[in-house]
Amino acid sequence: MHYRFISLALGAALAVSWHHSAHAANEVSPVQFIDTFAKIFGEHKGERKGHAKGVCFIGEFQGNSKLAAYSASPLLSGEVYPMIGRFSMPGGNPHAAENSRIPRGFAAQIQLSNGDLQHFALLSTPVFGAKNPASFLGLLQASIPDSITGKPDLKKIAAYRQAHPDTQGQADYLAKQAPPASYGHAAYFGLHTFYLSNASGKQQAVRWQLQPLDGIKGLTESEIAAPPHNFLEARLRERLAKGPLKFKFELVLAAEGYPLLDPSQAWPSQSKVLDAGEFRITQSDGDQCKNINFDPNVLASGITASDDPILQIRSAAYAISFGKRLTGQ
């Protein structure tokens, strides 16, 4: 019950690690996040510090070659590229309950023919759990279990959210939406702003997202209320036995006045959306993704990261987590 509450209280926020940057609010250190995750979830040596529970997959990506007006990146050339990825549960618990009200994660590494790598790290929530690293760290610290009861202080968390309203939107979304019934029945959102450049150097701010061609489907209330159990990996294998699992890759275009650097705010529903390609997952077994850290700041040529402080702080913490994992910490 403790892990299930923490997952609901923090939602997808617990899925994200950080990269230290001069832009990071109040000079928050990525080490603080790694240490705080351990205080919440405990030490799990050799495991990822975020998204500890998950399963690898392999497949391919093909971008839409008709978007030259927006991007000259080879990612969108129309060429088919190999992909290694990972579906996951957020947080640092490798035994997280799969029927709890927490999002799913989708991460992928695409190998381009010119040698470029493109990483994606997405969640099944359209907003992040805080507007900047300092606000998010405070939420985490407010959620550390009490040393006597072993449970989080609900009043403390509620008071923090009231004082920091940017932390409430994601929690509200998770409380209202049924958890995805499978990894293939969820939409996934990149949350952060990136910039595309065309051949003339003109830039366009975008957020990316994935739409499942199998459709969106949530768990039933009885499934959510059932005792914690595992089913996501088995459902994925069963689905792939029938053929590739496909996701439509979309680019949401920013317009004037959009919050480019605050992932806790959704963009307007009437935003222009481009069909940018397709992710096709063909197999899910093995450990091909084990040594990939899926840093979302690893980008193909023609694509650049924004100054979103949460995006910018992710690389360093991903690297710290990766180093700890490889050394059995």
Where would I find each of the regions flagged by the language model?
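Sec/Tat signal peptide C-region and signal peptidase I cleavage site
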Residues: W18-A24
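Bacterial N-terminal signal peptides
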Residues: A9-S17
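Bacterial N-terminal signal peptides that target proteins for export
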Residues: M1-L8
